[in-house]
């Protein structure tokens, strides 16, 4: 391919059209260095279309476009043909084919692919919430959360929080340590929102030893000591008993399995 300009015209951002053009260009050796892509977004008037056609006519460029408003699309096609400018309609024929095959009527509204729905924003918000209120960083998150996970170290609190966040649930998690008093919010929040993550001493002992090894540390450290683990789990049992919340045994469960159990529990509650 010799040096040429491809004009990407869109009534929205033009990202979709540019990606298609780049995919096509990639099929030609060395073409990415020889081809200039010029994106013209948010085209809604005939004047802009005439300007682009004049540019393409002058330098022998190609116009690739995603224009969903029929009048604007038809105008570009008509003007390009008058000027003998090569054009390619990326989305129009597909919309028309889908209307013909499925019997649906298109909305013909620019930018719909970027009109992110409420569901998407809820997911993003939940993920940000999980990060902000991870590992008991801010106890205020306990009262704002849909779910509060509590458990000793290495009971998958953080990955569970993130997994559930992708289901649009705001999750805070709180570590339970005998030497640290749990935040008072744990005892004022609705117990039905709290889930205790239970684990067997032997399983936790194995997990912690593997964790220490992965960090290059001695697996005989107090962190993986079975007596210390039993002490932590006894303290955990006292806390969940005081809260009066449900408990899920995570001993031999994958994160996905535990998350689905918790999700189902919350769904039934609602």
Swiss-Prot record:
Tell me the keywords, alphabetical order.
Kinase, Nucleotide-binding, Serine/threonine-protein kinase, Transferase
Q: Which reaction does it catalyse?
A: N(tele)-phospho-L-histidyl/L-threonyl-[pyruvate, phosphate dikinase] + ADP = N(tele)-phospho-L-histidyl/O-phospho-L-threonyl-[pyruvate, phosphate dikinase] + AMP + H(+); N(tele)-phospho-L-histidyl/O-phospho-L-threonyl-[pyruvate, phosphate dikinase] + phosphate + H(+) = N(tele)-phospho-L-histidyl/L-threonyl-[pyruvate, phosphate dikinase] + diphosphate
Q: Which Pfam families match?
A: Kinase-PPPase
Instruction: Please state the Enzyme Commission number of this protein.
Output: 2.7.11.32, 2.7.4.27
Q: Which GO terms describe its molecular function?
A: ADP binding; ATP binding; phosphotransferase activity, phosphate group as acceptor; protein serine/threonine kinase activity
Report the InterPro entries cross-referenced here: Kinase-pyrophosphorylase, PPDK_reg
Q: Which cysteines are joined by disulfide bonds?
A: none
Q: What positions does the entry give for ADP binding?
A: 151-158
The enzyme class is transferase
Asked if the keyword Coiled coil belongs to this entry, the reply reads no
As for family, the record states:
Belongs to the pyruvate, phosphate/water dikinase regulatory protein family. PDRP subfamily.
What is the role of the protein in this entry? Answer: Bifunctional serine/threonine kinase and phosphorylase involved in the regulation of the pyruvate, phosphate dikinase (PPDK) by catalyzing its phosphorylation/dephosphorylation.
User: Which PANTHER family does this UniProt record tie to the protein?
Assistant: PYRUVATE, PHOSPHATE DIKINASE REGULATORY PROTEIN 1, CHLOROPLASTIC (PTHR31756:SF3)
The name this protein carries in UniProt is: Putative pyruvate, phosphate dikinase regulatory protein
């Amino acid at each position: 391919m010799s040096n040429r300009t491809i004009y990407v015209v869109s009534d929205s951002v033009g990202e979709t059209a540019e990606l298609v053009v780049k995919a096509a260009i990639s099929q030609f050796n060395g073409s990415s260095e020889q081809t200039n892509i010029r994106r013209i977004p948010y085209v809604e008037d005939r004047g802009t279309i005439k300007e682009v056609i004049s540019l393409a006519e002058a330098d022998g460029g190609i116009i690739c476009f995603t224009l969903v408003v029929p009048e604007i699309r038809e105008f570009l096609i008509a003007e390009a043909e008058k000027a003998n400018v090569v054009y390619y309609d990326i989305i129009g024929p597909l919309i028309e084919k889908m209307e013909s095959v499925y019997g649906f009527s298109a909305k013909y509204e620019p930018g719909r692919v970027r009109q992110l729905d409420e569901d998407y924003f809820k997911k993003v918000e939940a993920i940000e919430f999980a990060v902000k209120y991870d590992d008991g960083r801010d106890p205020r998150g306990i009262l704002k959360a849909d779910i509060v996970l509590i458990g000793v170290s290495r009971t998958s609190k953080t990955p569970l929080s993130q997994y559930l966040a992708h289901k649009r649930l705001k999750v805070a998690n709180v570590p339970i340590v005998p030497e640290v008093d749990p935040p008072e919010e744990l005892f004022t929040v609705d117990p039905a929102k709290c889930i205790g993550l239970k684990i067997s001493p032997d399983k936790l002992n194995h997990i912690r030893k593997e964790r220490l090894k992965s960090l290059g540390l001695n697996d005989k450290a107090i962190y993986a000591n079975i007596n210390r683990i039993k002490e932590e789990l006894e303290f955990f049992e006292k806390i969940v008993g005081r809260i009066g919340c449900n408990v899920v045994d995570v001993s031999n469960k994958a994160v996905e399995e535990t998350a689905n159990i918790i999700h189902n529990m919350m769904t039934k509650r609602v």
